[in-house]
Amino acid sequence: EDIYKINPKKLEPVDILVGGFPCQAFSVAGYRKGFKDPRGNLFYEIARFIDELKRKPKALMLENVKNLSSHDRGRTKKAIENILFDFGYYVHWQVYNTFKYTDIPQNRERTIITCFMNKNSYSYFLNNPIQKTSNLKPIASILQKKRINEKYYYFQDSQYYNMFKKEIKNRN
């Protein structure tokens, strides 16, 4: 549902609010219009949401592009921080690379803003860095070890070979 149409006062209290707002307004790949871009203003909808909930969440995690903290010479970061501080949050900004913390084989740096109402929770978070956990298995462990029946292969003498060869190279 469109966030503009949701009334936070009608929602049950939440302990943790996780969200993001469009990054195009802050990205070095975009025009970097920031809050002058309507998409950049969606942060203010998150702020409205927090403000109007029956009880402010105990913790927030917000995500955006790496460039967010340096956008507009740091003024964007300051504006966001001031709002979160006014709500009573302890605020921490950090850039994480998904490759370092996940099994995603891609270097993708993102700014993560973590906020806590409780100073002890905030301190605990800062003193216990996130560790990478991996559920990946070596590829050899999932490959089939027995010989595959030849009926599953298309050899050059197959009536479909040339068609498949052509389609595999087709960009459409």
Map each language-model feature to its residues.
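Short acidic/polar capping segments at secondary-structure boundaries
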Residues: K66-N67, T98-Y101, N118-N120
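Short glycine-biased active-site loop of nucleotidyltransferases that positions the nucleotide triphosphate
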Residues: P8-L11, T102-Q106
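A short helix->loop->beta-strand "cap" motif at the edges of active sites that frequently abuts
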Residues: K54-A59, E109
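Conserved S-adenosyl-L-methionine
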Residues: E1-D2, G88-K100
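S-adenosyl-L-methionine-dependent DNA methyltransferase catalytic core
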Residues: P8, I83-F87, E109-N172
